Swiss-Prot record:
The keyword S-adenosyl-L-methionine applies. It catalyses: 4-demethyl-7-[(3S)-3-amino-3-carboxypropyl]wyosine(37) in tRNA(Phe) + S-adenosyl-L-methionine = 7-[(3S)-3-amino-3-carboxypropyl]wyosine(37) in tRNA(Phe) + S-adenosyl-L-homocysteine + H(+). Belongs to the TYW3 family. This is tRNA wybutosine-synthesizing protein 3 homolog. Its EC number is 2.1.1.282. It holds the Pfam family TYW3. The gene is TYW3. Probable S-adenosyl-L-methionine-dependent methyltransferase that acts as a component of the wybutosine biosynthesis pathway. Wybutosine is a hyper modified guanosine with a tricyclic base found at the 3'-position adjacent to the anticodon of eukaryotic phenylalanine tRNA. It comes from the Eukaryota. Pathway: tRNA modification; wybutosine-tRNA(Phe) biosynthesis. It is an enzyme of class 2 (transferase). Residues 200-216, 226-241 have a biased composition (Basic and acidic residues). GO terms for cellular component: cytoplasm. One of its GO terms (biological process) is wybutosine biosynthetic process.
C-alpha cells in the first residue's frame, strides 16, 4: 500500500475510536493544539494530557507507583488547595502519593521530516524531554514531554506522614508548576502555528529544496532553542534558560517496535 494512503487509513482509524480516557474528552488547555494537528494531513494525535495534580493510593505491598493498579483519590487539571487534598487523604488506607504531571502529547507523523518539525517546536517551547520513535512498520511517533514533574509520598498504610503545613507547601510548588506548564503549552501552540505556516509556504514554493534543507538544518542543530529563531522570543529564551530541571538535549531514538 502507498505510504500516504496507509497513513491516511491509520489516521482515520485512530480519530474514529471512542475516547477511553478517564475524562472522556480532550483537556481544555490542549484542544486548540489537538485540532490544529489533526487538521493537517501529515499528523494525528493518539493521546494527550494537558497536565494535572493527582493524589494516588497504591497497595500497601506495592513498591512502585503503578497508576493502573492505583486508586485515584483526587484528579485536578486546575490549581488545588490544601483542603482538597486533606479530604481526599481521609479515604486512603494504603500509601498515598501526591503528583504533578506536566503535558504529555503523542503525535503520529507521516514521515520523519514531519516529526522533526514538531520536535523542534517542542524543544523550543520548553518540553526538552521530547523524542521521536520509529517503529518497524515505519510508524513515526513524536512524544512531547518534560521532566517538570513532582512526586511526593504523603501517607503510609493510611497514616499521614507529613504535616498539613507541608502539604500546603507542596501544593504551592505543584500549582506553580501547573502555571508554568500552561505557559509552555501556550508557547508550544504559538510556535506550532508559526512552524506550520512556514512549512506550508516553503512547500508551495520550493518542495524539493525544502526537504533537503530541512534535513540538513535539523542534523546541524547544537542548540535548538536558539537555532529555531522563528519560535523563541527574547522573553521566552530567558524563561527557558531557567528550566534547570529539563534535559536540554535532543532525543531522537529509533526502536524496532510497532506503534
Amino acid at each position: 500500500m502507498d505510504r500516504r494512503a496507509e497513513f491516511k487509513r491509520w489516521k482515520a482509524q485512530c480519530l474514529s475510536k471512542a475516547d477511553f480516557s478517564r475524562k472522556g474528552c480532550v483537556d481544555e488547555d490542549v484542544v486548540e493544539i489537538v485540532q490544529l494537528l489533526n487538521g493537517r494531513e501529515q499528523f494525528f494525535t493518539t493521546s494527550s494530557c494537558a497536565g494535572r495534580i493527582i493524589l494516588l493510593e497504591q497497595g500497601m505491598d506495592s513498591l512502585e507507583v503503578q497508576k493502573q493498579n492505583c486508586c485515584w483519590l483526587l484528579v485536578s487539571h486546575k490549581p488545588c488547595v490544601k483542603d482538597d487534598v486533606i479530604v481526599a487523604l481521609k479515604k486512603a488506607n494504603g500509601d498515598a502519593i501526591l503528583k504533578f504531571e506536566p503535558l504529555v502529547l503523542h503525535v503520529q507523523c507521516r514521515q520523519l521530516q514531519d516529526a522533526q518539525i514538531l520536535h523542534s517546536v517542542a524543544i523550543d517551547s520548553g518540553f526538552r524531554n521530547s523524542g521521536i520513535t520509529v517503529g518497524k512498520r515505519g510508524k513515526t511517533m513524536l512524544a512531547v514531554r518534560s521532566t517538570h514533574g513532582l512526586e511526593v509520598p504523603l501517607s503510609h498504610k493510611g497514616k499521614l506522614m507529613v504535616t498539613e503545613e507541608y502539604i500546603d507547601f507542596l501544593l504551592k510548588i505543584a500549582n506553580h508548576k501547573m502555571e508554568e506548564n500552561k505557559k509552555r503549552i501556550e508557547r508550544f501552540y504559538n510556535c506550532l502555528q508559526l512552524a506550520l505556516e512556514k512549512e506550508t509556504t516553503t512547500t508551495n514554493s520550493h518542495p524539493k529544496e525544502k526537504i533537503k534543507e530541512k534535513n540538513n538544518s535539523y542534523k546541524k542543530k547544537s542548540n535548538p532553542g536558539k537555532a529555531h529563531d522563528k519560535c523563541v522570543t527574547e522573553e521566552n529564551d530567558k524563561v527557558l534558560e531557567n528550566d534547570d530541571d529539563d534535559d536540554p538535549g535532543i532525543s531522537v531514538t529509533i526502536f524496532p517496535e510497532d506503534y
